[in-house]
Amino acid sequence: MYQIPKLPLQLDVETKAVLKQLNSANKKLAELKGVALTIPNESILINTLILQEAKESSAVENIITTHDDLYKADAELKSFAVSASTKEVVQYAGALKRGFDLIRNNKILTLSIIKEVQEVLECNKAGFRRLPGTNLKNQRQEVVYTPPQSYDEIVLHMDNLERYINDDSLQDVDPLIKMAIIHHQFESVHPFYDGNGRTGRIVNSLYLVIKELLDLPILYLSRYIIKNKSEYYRLIQSVRDNGNWEEWILFVLKGVEETAEETIVLVKQIKILMQEYKEKMKIVMGKQYSHELLNNLFNHPYTKIDFIIQDLNVSRVTATAYLNKLVSNGLLEKLKLGHSNFYLNTALTQILIEHSPKADDCFEKIESISKMI
């Protein structure tokens, strides 16, 4: 039976193979941090990429929604009937944003913050598990792991994890290696009744920010996990069964490198598209052009009149005129759902869809925008 270790681990985790992969991962992560700074309005990356991460992290748990449904829900289209799965994905995005708001200034990730993230994610205040009976099962419904059952033991391990997250004097090891250890420890403690996997992946994103490896929580680790789902769970269990920390840490470091590279490409594509839109909008809109209008079209894959009114502080008539002019010049597509009009940035949504995992990997068939509406 696996005994959850007290952190730091009493073994050398910086093997030759780990250090080699660590160098590659850190280089790629530093490049992503720099590329992200080329988008001057951080809310664009926060809003668009967090929605992507929310969708993909939820897909790891077989909570599936389409891009189309997710963007409609994000646009708060009242006439759109939101599915239970889409609500859960939107809640994930809200939980990640809430966590980022809580850690961005003091750069500390406490248990109270982790609990609040899970509370937003699951819409309950149950906190850490107090009742026994939680077991982790495989697809054949066989118990493969039993996490701590008593509340006191859970609190003991989580207090230790909190200190390990925030106190680098406990172990002189690179933050990315620590992140791999933290993620495994959180999964093994399994402190909540629900939402442990998704909360753990949010902790990953927030940890990269508090260690200043990224300024924004925009790394796509969930995409890598989806593509390597069976290996992900195999390696988590391999640590418990065989103490195979090296292979697990290598898996995480490779994930950081791979997903950082993919996110770099995505951010660059968004930047290029924004520049193209800026040039076209200056011609189309003339003196009516503003950075706020451009930013709005990239903050929300689906925008609406109310968003324009709010962001630009203009009247409803003016906001409607702006959007209709952009539609008539091919920069947006006007769509109607019930009594609501909304405006789709098709070029942006296409980029985001193309950067999602393949349909077979996340159990989702993504159809064209026109078919989904």
Please place each PLM-identified region on the residue numbering.
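FIC/Doc superfamily catalytic core
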Residues: 1-373
